[in-house]
Amino acid sequence: MKKVTAMLFSMAVGLNAVSMAAKAKASEEQETDVLLIGGGIMSATLGTYLRELEPEWSMTMVERLEGVAQESSNGWNNAGTGHSALMELNYTPQNADGSISIEKAVAINEAFQISRQFWAHQVERGVLRTPRSFINTVPHMSFVWGEDNVNFLRARYAALQQSSLFRGMRYSEDHAQIKEWAPLVMEGRDPQQKVAATRTEIGTDVNYGEITRQLIASLQKKSNFSLQLSSEVRALKRNDDNTWTVTVADLKNGTAQNIRAKFVFIGAGGAALKLLQESGIPEAKDYAGFPVGGQFLVSENPDVVNHHLAKVYGKASVGAPPMSVPHIDTRVLDGKRVVLFGPFATFSTKFLKNGSLWDLMSSTTTSNVMPMMHVGLDNFDLVKYLVSQVMLSEEDRFEALKEYYPQAKKEDWRLWQAGQRVQIIKRDADKGGVLRLGTEVVSDQQGTIAALLGASPGASTAAPIMLDLLEKVFGDRVSSPQWQATLKAIVPSYGRKLNGDVAATERELQYTSEVLGLKYDKPQAADSTPKPQLKPQPVQKEVADIAL
């Protein structure tokens, strides 16, 4: 008995020693001006802005995985589109009278121009190197079939000609012309099928993972920047002086460390919601999250890859979320061209591809459970869509592919699981809760902590999103002459709109194209098209949108 007691005592002492060691390690507090949680493109972009704006500020980045850009920013975990609304039909909804609304498309395009300018500036500074490694010219096309859809595309094309941002777009209903643009899409198609397409030569394919890695590599060259990998945030606590003490666990050796930060950015993708909740700020109580994953069919067969050089987006079917539009894309990943088709929605309770099955449950609180229930009850069509997607067979996915590639062969394609996208659910006074497409910066009133929630358009608008964050959190500094001058050097069009100013639009497109090695020819006259018939649209229940 004495031996057992002694053994238990020894074990207790040993465990206590381990615990004390961990606490001692945690008490060794590191101080930093800015703490960036998450090693993705958002944290990398914000860190790059702040490095130019305040080069003396110290920064620490913590990432849970063993490398940066391994979740949604990774090139294989997203569609790699430079979202500028050149082909994405969901950004130009049709009004009840049949007319087309282009406001959202203009806003998306303006945002992407900011990203292009930001990247071009970083290339000129030597922060980003070899533009071809992360951005390439890939024409953007919209492609539809059927009388109603063709009429919609006519109306969309005509409406977009009102904007200086969409000059140079081509339009055709001719099979031969569309085949020249996208042979893979047209070969084997019924020659009597009514089709239409638009094409913009200045579209892009972007490897956001490569951008992230290069931005962070540049930050690491400075002595006042620290990158901590395999490091998971376990707790966030506000101090009396409005700084934050963040407890970070080393996942390799089990020790913990406290980091005291003046400003905390939570750019952890799907994990951002849970960390925002952990902070305890009242603003977090308005939000919940719902995870949706995406799958793509991938072909690396040279006969397929070399026969297709475009991103071709279709139109979402009735009853499906507008953002679920199928597309068949040329991708350039790690210097190699591949073709992707999708997305197909998947469901998992994980908030990250490398997350936990408990993520959804652990983020559900007494504050957000009712908004989540309201969203579920109010969006039954969306629930039906997700169920139907999860139930798709291999044959179903292949048949969907053949609508865009009639001569596709099964043996040329494999299925790839891309990243998780956590959709924003926000408390709403009228509806109880609403599903919000897009991204949203959530911060405390003091401007000491901010998180980015949401998924779309995401990485392609990282530069303007982080500009919005700077204005929201560092408003006084942003209005100072020093910051204004620096921001206008980084983003020449900062503070003004390009839309409506043909000369300014062409100047910025020419500049970014030259620096980034992209194709750009001055736009020619618009194509003549049949006049669209503006028919009143039948009233249909709106389907909430989601990002895949």
UniProtKB/Swiss-Prot annotation:
Belongs to the MQO family. This is Probable malate:quinone oxidoreductase. Residues 521-548 are annotated as: Disordered. One of its GO terms (molecular function) is 2-hydroxyglutarate dehydrogenase activity. The keyword Oxidoreductase applies. Keywords: FAD, Flavoprotein, Oxidoreductase, Tricarboxylic acid cycle. One of its GO terms (biological process) is tricarboxylic acid cycle. It comes from the Bacteria. InterPro entries: FAD/NAD-bd_sf, MQO. Residues 530-541 have a biased composition (Low complexity). It catalyses: (S)-malate + a quinone = a quinol + oxaloacetate. It holds the Pfam family Mqo. PANTHER family: L-2-HYDROXYGLUTARATE DEHYDROGENASE, MITOCHONDRIAL. Disulfide bonds: none annotated. Its EC number is 1.1.5.4. Its cofactor is FAD. The keyword Oxidoreductase applies. Pathway: Carbohydrate metabolism; tricarboxylic acid cycle; oxaloacetate from (S)-malate (quinone route): step 1/1. HAMAP family: MQO (MF_00212).
